Amino acid sequence: YGYSASVSPYILNQFEQEVGYKFRPEYIIDQGYYNNQYRVPSKEFRDFQAFQRREVAKLAKEMVDITHACGCEAMMFLGDHWIGTEPFMPEFKTIGLDAVVGSVGNGSTLRLISDIEGVKYTEGRFLPYFFPDTFHEGGDPVREAKENWVTARRAILRKPIDRIGYGGYLKLALQFPEFVDYVESVCNEFRELYENIKGTTPYCVKRVAVLNCWGKMRAWGCHMVHHALYYKQNYSYAGVIEMLSGAPFDVKFISFEDIKNDPHLLDSLDVIINVGDADTAHTGGIWWEDPEISSAIRKFVWNGGGFIGVGEPSGHPYQGHILQLASVLGVEEENGFTLN
C-alpha cells in the first residue's frame, strides 16, 4: 500500500517528534518482508501508518482546496499505492474529495469502492481496458467484459457504485462493434439495477464480521494482491471475501484491537470469520496469546454466536496448541509434537 516507499529524512524527523521515540529502519524493513498485509503489524509500524494518514490527508486537502477554488470537482483514482489515503479510516473524510473511482476486477474490488463514505459519488472502471493485450486480432474482449460484469454484478446488488465506465484507447474498441454493443447492454442493465437499489437496504440474513489484525482499514482488501489477480497461495482465502461481497449478510471488518477496546463489540454479531494461514495478520498470530481475546471469542460462541474458520484459524504455536481455538473448532493441527 505504499508506506514502505514513503520514507524520507523530513518524514522521519516529523515522525520522531510526534511519537517521542527514534525511528529504526527495521520498522520498515521488517526482516525483509516490508510489512506486507500478511505480516502481523508491529506497534511502531501502526504508529507510522497513523502518522502518514494524518500528514497525507493534510497535503491532499490542500490539493483538493485548489481544485475546488478553480470551480472543479476533485476525484481520486483508487490505485495500488495509497500511502495514507485509507478510504475506510477517519482521516480520509477530512480530505474533502468529491468522488472516488477505481478499477473493478471482481466483487471485492467493487465493494472496496462502493463502501467508501464521505464522498458525493463513487465510480467503477470496468474491464477490459481498451489496450492491445485484449483488443487485437483474435482477441475476445466480449468474453472478458462478460466475466467482469457478471462477477461484479453480485456486489452491486448489495452496495452499488454510482457510476460505471471503461478506459483505454477508444479507437481499439471501435474495431470490435460486438464489444460496443455488449457495453451498451451492460450500461442499460446497470441503470436498471441502480434505480431499484440506490438508497435501499438489502435484505440481510445475518451480521457477519471478518476478524483479523487490520479490521476496517483493509475492508474488502483482505488477501487481495495486485488488484484481485489469481494466486494459488491465497485463492481460497480471497474467495471467502469475494463470496461475502455479494452475499445477503451485513458484513463488517473488525480487528483484535477493536475487541480489546470494546468489550461489547461482539454482542451485535451473529458470526465471526477468521480466514488465512497461521501466524499471519489475517488469523492473528501473537494476538492469540492475549487471554482477553481468546476468552471474548469463546464467550461469544458459548452464547450462541457462530465462528467459521478457514485455513488455520487462530493458528499460533502457544501453550501446547497450534490452533488456539482448538476446543471451539473441535480440531487441532498436528505438527509432530503430539505424536506420543
How does the language model describe each region?
Residues 1-97, 103-112, 198:
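Polysaccharide-binding and catalytic clefts of secreted carbohydrate-active enzymes
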Residues 133-144, 217-232, 280-291, 318-322:
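Short, flexible/disordered intra-domain loops and linkers
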Residues 71-72, 119-120, 303-306:
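A short helix->loop->beta-strand "cap" motif at the edges of active sites that frequently abuts
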Residues 74-77, 98-102, 120-128, 162-166:
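Hydrophobic faces of well-ordered beta-strands that scaffold small-molecule active sites
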Residues 283-340:
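A glycine-rich, often tryptophan-bearing local segment used as a flexible ligand/cofactor-contacting loop or short
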Residues 91-94, 110-122, 156-159:
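Acidic (Asp/Glu)-rich catalytic clusters
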Residues 153, 159, 181-269:
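Aromatic-Pro/Gly-enriched surface loop or interdomain linker
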Residues 38-43, 113-143, 173-176, 216:
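Active-site clefts of carbohydrate-active enzymes
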